[in-house]
């Protein structure tokens, strides 16, 4: 077995499509087995962005298996700690260990100034993009600690975790919070040889970003913005 993470197991949230799928496939290419979760359903009735589906998660599963790697996949909401823990525990029992946590799941909604953001949009955003990250790490990190072999945790923040943009204040707050989680987990888990980092993507060609609502948000100067206008 060859590859940079050969013999490792990675837990990835939001793995049905987009960045989560790309992480799963890339890690599998480098020799890792995968525990993959995604809600595969709307986060709330107010969600404007089409959600990932069970078929999307099945496609991720097939892509990993076609690379000769094992995968445990389940439909799980990152807001549900008990469900997350159950899947991680089952995955570790089946795959034998856990080395990497990739807390990637996230949503986009709204598009109002903070003083006009609805309580529902605010709550959904914080529950998924901030609390969901914390719950994902909390559910999985005991395995890294108990193994005593270190490990790696990657939290998906955003360029919005480094600076502010108008009309996305709840998203900005959540992603800045992810940076706080990263820094705190890093100082708390360093004694176990576990390193913790955040990544900060900008515009990414995924369904979460390349949709009518988001394109209109970022290009209000255009009547009908398209993907080319987002470059």
Segments and roles (model prediction):
Residues 3-41:
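Canonical Rossmann dinucleotide-binding motif of NAD(H)/NADP(H)-dependent dehydrogenases/reductases
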Residues 142, 187-191:
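Alpha-helical segment proximal to the catalytic Tyr-Lys
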Residues 54-55, 75-87, 119:
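The beta1-alpha1 cofactor-binding region of Rossmann-like NAD(H)/NADP(H)-dependent oxidoreductases
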Residues 112-114, 118-126:
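Substrate-binding pocket helix/loop in short-chain dehydrogenase/reductase
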Residues 137, 174, 182:
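Active-site helix of classical SDR
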Residues 158:
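Residue(s) in the substrate-gating loop at a strand-loop-helix junction
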Residues 117, 164-172, 184, 212:
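Active-site loop-to-helix junction immediately N-terminal to the catalytic Tyr of the SDR YXXXK motif
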């Amino acid at each position: 077995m060859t590859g940079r993470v050969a013999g490792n197991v990675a837990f990835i949230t939001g793995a049905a499509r987009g960045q989560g799928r790309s992480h799963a496939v890339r890690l599998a290419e480098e020799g890792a087995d995968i525990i993959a979760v995604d809600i595969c359903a709307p986060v709330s009735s107010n969600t404007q962005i089409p959600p990932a589906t069970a078929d999307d998660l099945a496609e991720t599963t097939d892509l990993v298996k076609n690379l000769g790697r094992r995968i445990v996949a389940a439909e799980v909401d990152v807001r549900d700690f008990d469900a997350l823990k159950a899947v991680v525990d089952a995955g570790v029992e089946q795959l034998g260990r856990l080395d990497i946590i990739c807390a990637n799941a996230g949503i986009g909604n709204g598009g109002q100034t903070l003083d006009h953001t609805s309580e529902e949009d605010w709550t959904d955003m914080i529950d998924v993009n901030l609390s969901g990250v914390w719950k994902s790490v909390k559910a999985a990190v005991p395995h890294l600690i108990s193994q005593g072999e270190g490990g790696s945790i990657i939290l998906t923040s955003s360029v919005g975790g480094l600076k502010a943009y108008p009309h996305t204040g709840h998203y900005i707050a959540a992603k800045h919070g992810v940076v706080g989680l990263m820094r705190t987990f890093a100082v708390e888990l360093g004694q176990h040889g576990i390193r913790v980092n955040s990544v900060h993507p900008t515009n990414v060609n995924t369904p979460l970003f390349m949709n009518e609502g988001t394109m209109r948000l970022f290009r209000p100067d255009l009547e009908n913005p398209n993907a080319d206008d987002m470059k």
